[in-house]
Amino acid sequence: RRVLKPGGTIWISGTLHSIYSIGVALQQELYKIINNITWKKTNPPPNLACRCFTHSTETILWARKDEKKARHLFNYEQMKQMNGGKQMKDVWEGSLTRPSEKWAGRHPTQKPEYLLERIILASTKKGDVVLDPFCGSGTTGVVSGKYGRQFIGIDNNEEYLDIAKRRLDQIQEALEW
């Protein structure tokens, strides 16, 4: 809460194993959940155990501080434009991360760039700072850089930080052209 600006927002992605307790924790910490977005994966990993339905979705919570004067940014028109002129709904359908986005190394929960593109473009403007305290392979940083946002990434795994650094170095070189 301390580093989030009054109009800033927080996005958290999770599976059924954790997202509900995260939602409760957000509310206990006086955050207001703006949206509960379902990412419907068009190519989920197979259900090898065959003891439940195939896990084909993840939930993304979008929240802000629950303060009367806190007005968050939502780039409604841009989201509508990205969705073929129609209102964007809270179910986002798309594939898992493409192999071309994993060239720098593998991360078990790497998100596809199109997913972070929607998140970043929906709730930030050029020059804004995007913080990812679990940056993993750096997808948030890559997309932030592509769209003129500043990025701060944190992770506790050196191997994943190396992957993120390689990806961020490549985007930085491309942007300097």
Q: Where in this protein do the model-derived segments appear?
A:
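Core catalytic lobe of class I
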Residues: 1-162
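S-adenosyl-L-methionine
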Residues: 165-177
